[in-house]
Curated annotation (Swiss-Prot):
GO terms for molecular function: DNA-binding transcription activator activity, RNA polymerase II-specific; macrolide binding; peptidyl-prolyl cis-trans isomerase activity; protein folding chaperone. It comes from Candida albicans (strain SC5314 / ATCC MYA-2876). GO terms for biological process: chromatin organization; negative regulation of homoserine biosynthetic process; nonfunctional rRNA decay; regulation of chaperone-mediated protein folding; transcription by RNA polymerase II. Residues 23-122 form the PPIase FKBP-type domain. The keyword Transmembrane does not apply. The lineage of its organism: Eukaryota, Fungi, Dikarya, Ascomycota, Saccharomycotina. It is found in: Cytoplasm. It is an enzyme of class 5 (isomerase). This is FK506-binding protein 1.
Length: 124
């Protein structure tokens, strides 16, 4: 049985030239919500973008896949995220925190919804 892939809805196209690949450092703004709309985290509300290395397990697998456009065979038609892209990522539990969740904030097998904006790749 193959894993579900993230769902990606592009809200605003990026530059379509600057794409992150595994091992790159990305800077993003995000708002994380449960499917019921309850917000559990927000870099925007903290007033500071989030920086991480993608594709190396530093963040949830759904982010690693989405932010590096590394969807495998099943994701050939999924939208690509480039610098400047604003998107809504719907991350299934198998690509988020799975059956363990992060009690009491994120329950077991929760689907997560992130509004993300890719601000930069490797400082660009």
């Amino acid at each position: 049985m193959s894993e579900e892939l993230p769902q990606i809805e592009i809200v605003q196209e990026g530059d379509n030239t600057t794409f992150a690949k595994p091992g790159d450092t990305v800077t993003i703004h995000y708002d994380g919500k449960l499917t019921n709309g309850k917000e559990f985290d927000s870099s925007r509300k903290r007033g500071k973008p989030f920086t991480c290395t993608v594709g190396v397990g530093q963040v949830i697998k759904g982010w690693d896949i989405s932010l590096t456009n590394n969807y495998g065979k099943g994701g050939a038609n999924l939208p690509k995220i480039s610098k400047g892209t604003k998107a809504i990522l719907t991350i299934p539990p198998n690509l988020a925190y799975g059956p363990r969740g992060i009690p009491p904030i994120i329950g077991p097998n929760e689907t997560l919804v992130f509004e993300v904006e890719l601000l930069g790749v490797n400082g660009q």
